């Protein structure tokens, strides 16, 4: 009997495929049955080799050895996943396996993950591609019935290779260059550094902003409505006008203009739009939203989440009304739902995957059994579908231009003619969006008529600085970076992709370049002193959002066979070579780049400073360190963060609530810090309530 080997990206996805295919016999690292072997990759099994594999001299960081630009790229099997790679390699070489299916995630990274394993395993057998946008059983069966030739995705693989190798070259060379120049570890990334630069520039603009006061005169009309004057820089000028208006007591209607307007329904979600709304309305980080969406996808409740499209293809039009009705009922929408399918259909704007949708399975699922976060994300996706196919929100806007005391005053009013899609938005998301401000209604007056003034007052305001970046605003900035400077018609501008933006933000936070501050629902992302210092010494070509966005566009062109991979890689190598030969340490930067002191070493009394992987004693002879990735704190289901490190160094102890035992029980305890005989840190527990 011959077998077809199916290789997925994760065990959970592999299990779902195995169930549909009838491969029900569980083996070590794979499923077997019905002519199929179904296994998985556990993410990236094969990784780019570190520099020292190419040459032992690269073990030591030196500017003299830069740039490091491999001519023949080398790969290694990840140490933590060697067993699973061995299983896949053995399965690929089994004599009874005559073909393979790449069923890793349907995108750039999924293509790369499979192909690297295939090549590292030395496999030569033919393989085809499973390309799905839904994990529903019907979609899986349809996908396996219509497998695609692997050659259709060669260009996608080339783009993935270029992305991976460009990131490696920029990260390795720039990190070593700037670490050597400034005498401390500095992590630099092709995507990460421009995103950090955007936050630093924004905070600099806020710090440099000087608010300016202004004054207006507001007239309350006897028949309803309020008319406002222009802004005055001088309070005395506004007070003089106020006095004149009070004496005059009437306004003359110079012009009344009424226009009927409409607000189109919002587009369906792509991943970035979903992450933005989830942050704005629910306070979720981009990574949390992606994690929830991925889980919902694997539970067959939504379609593929890592999409950059906000439209559907023409062949989906016929089934959409049924999906809208069924998902509406799942959320207790009993009234008829207007369904205008054509406004969400445009196959020309669909790339790898269509817009995010709930599935038919979602309409039948027990949503109450879902974790709260997943339930909220599903609600957002369903609400967006019901709104997107709805009718326009129509209203009449009235603008009044009046004269009082020789000065022009204006007033605006609004009357809703048809709620349209906003009815569904309020029904689905009313608690999240809150009560909307009632629009002002103006009196029905004729031009050149006069109206009495019921009251007049002076109002003081001031100009506002730019807003701090929330994840919502930063995602938007990443998505639209360089859009103004890109040629018209270029499809993708921006930094990163929908699939990678969340990870970029998380990496900046984890490395201590960004920090989240604020309430649970409204947190802003602020650059730390370390982040500001890094950007201060970075040359323009490394921190430029425009250059990074240009690279993303070129990767898309490679994906579409519109650009040769070699051309892109040559450009990256030339930029790196130029960077290495022309960059010098910035004058006066040493003080700026100084490590942050957070306390005193309990072993030798010298200063303890923060670095990328922990808090280290400045005394090179001392072995004291508090590791950020700390095994002791992990056993308590806690993190050793800056606040905890500060408390430990200052008081020698820190009280922790809701620690977890190995059996899952919670307890409170105090962690005590001491030192071993050789100076290494040592932790112990002092219990309060028992375990």
Show where each model-derived region lies.
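Secretory-pathway/luminal and periplasmic proteins that interact with or process carbohydrate-rich
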Residues: 299-305
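Intrinsically disordered, low-complexity regulatory segments
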Residues: 1-164, 168, 438, 454, ...
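Short, polar/flexible loop-turn hinges at active-site or ligand-entry regions and domain interfaces
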Residues: 73-76, 104, 124-128, 149-156, ...
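C-terminal or mid-to-C-terminal helical accessory/interaction module adjacent to the motor/catalytic core
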Residues: 73, 95, 137-221, 258-262
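Metal- or metallocofactor-binding catalytic centers and their adjacent structured scaffolds
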Residues: 235-269, 275
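Basic, low-complexity terminal or inter-domain segments flanking catalytic cores
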Residues: 2-5, 81, 92, 98, ...
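Amphipathic alpha-helical transducer elements in NTP-driven molecular machines
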Residues: 11-18, 35-38, 42, 78-89, ...
């Amino acid at each position: 009997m011959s077998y077809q080997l199916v290789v997925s990206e994760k065990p959970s996805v592999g299990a779902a495929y195995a169930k549909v295919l009838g491969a029900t016999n569980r083996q070590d690292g794979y499923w077997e049955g019905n002519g199929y072997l179904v296994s998985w990759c556990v993410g990236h099994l094969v990784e780019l080799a570190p520099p020292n594999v190419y040459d032992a001299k690269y073990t030591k960081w030196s500017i003299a050895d830069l740039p490091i630009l491999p001519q023949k790229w080398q790969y290694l099997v990840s140490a933590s996943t060697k067993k699973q790679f061995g299983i896949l390699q053995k399965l690929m070489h089994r004599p009874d396996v005559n073909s393979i299916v790449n069923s890793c995630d349907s995108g750039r990274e999924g293509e790369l993950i499979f192909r690297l394993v295939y090549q590292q395993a030395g496999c030569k057998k033919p393989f085809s591609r499973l390309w799905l946008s839904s994990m529903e059983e019907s979609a899986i069966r349809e996908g396996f019935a219509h497998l695609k030739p692997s050659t259709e995705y060669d260009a996608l693989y080339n783009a993935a290779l270029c992305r991976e190798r460009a990131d490696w070259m920029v990260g390795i060379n720039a990190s070593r260059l700037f670490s050597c120049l400034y005498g401390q570890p500095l992590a630099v990334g092709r995507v990460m550094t421009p995103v950090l630069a955007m936050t630093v520039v924004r905070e600099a603009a806020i710090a440099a902003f000087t608010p300016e006061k202004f004054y207006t005169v507001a007239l309350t009309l006897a028949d309803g409505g309020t008319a406002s004057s222009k802004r005055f820089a001088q309070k005395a000028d506004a007070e003089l006008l106020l006095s004149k208006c009070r004496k005059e007591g009437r306004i003359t209607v110079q012009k009344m203009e009424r226009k009927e307007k409409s607000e189109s329904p919002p587009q369906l979600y792509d991943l970035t739009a979903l992450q933005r709304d989830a942050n704005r309305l629910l306070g979720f980080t981009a990574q949390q939203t992606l994690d929830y969406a991925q889980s919902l996808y694997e539970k067959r409740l939504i379609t593929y989440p890592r999409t950059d499209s906000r439209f559907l293809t023409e062949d989906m039009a016929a089934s959409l009304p049924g999906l809208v009705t069924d998902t509406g009922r799942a959320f207790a929408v009993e009234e008829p739902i207007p369904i205008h399918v054509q406004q969400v259909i445009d196959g020309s704007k669909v790339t790898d995957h269509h817009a995010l949708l709930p599935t038919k399975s979602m309409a039948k699922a027990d949503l109450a059994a879902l974790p709260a976060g997943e339930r909220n994300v599903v609600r957002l996706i369903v609400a967006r579908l019901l709104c997107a196919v709805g009718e326009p929100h129509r209203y009449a806007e009235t603008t009044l231009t009046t004269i009082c005391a020789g000065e022009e005053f204006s007033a605006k009013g609004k009357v809703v003619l048809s709620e349209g899609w906003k009815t569904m938005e309020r029904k689905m998301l009313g608690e999240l969006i809150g009560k909307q401000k009632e629009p002002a209604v103006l009196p029905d007056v004729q031009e050149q008529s006069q109206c009495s003034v019921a009251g007049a007052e002076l109002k003081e305001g001031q100009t506002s600085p730019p807003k701090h970046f929330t994840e919502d605003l930063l995602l938007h900035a990443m998505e639209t970076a360089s859009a103004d400077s890109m040629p018209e018609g270029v499809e993708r501008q921006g930094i990163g992709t929908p699939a990678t933006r969340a990870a970029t933000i998380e990496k900046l936070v984890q490395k201590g370049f960004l920090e989240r501050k604020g309430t649970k629902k409204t947190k802003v992302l602020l650059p730390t002193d370390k982040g500001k210092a890094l950007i201060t010494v970075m040359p323009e070509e490394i921190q430029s959002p425009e250059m990074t966005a240009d690279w993303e566009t070129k990767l898309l062109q490679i994906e579409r066979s519109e650009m040769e991979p070699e051309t892109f890689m040559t450009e990256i190598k030339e930029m790196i070579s130029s960077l290495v030969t022309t960059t010098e340490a910035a004058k006066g930067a040493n003080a700026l780049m100084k490590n942050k002191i957070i306390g005193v070493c309990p072993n030798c009394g010298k200063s303890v400073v923060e670095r990328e992987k922990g808090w280290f004693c400045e005394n090179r002879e001392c072995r004291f360190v508090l590791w950020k990735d700390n095994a002791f704190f992990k056993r308590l289901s806690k993190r050793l963060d800056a606040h905890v490190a500060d408390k430990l160094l200052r008081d020698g102890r820190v009280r922790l609530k809701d620690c977890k035992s190995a059996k899952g029980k919670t307890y409170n305890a105090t962690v005590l810090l001491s030192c071993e005989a050789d100076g290494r840190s040592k932790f112990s527990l002092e219990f309060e309530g028992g375990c």
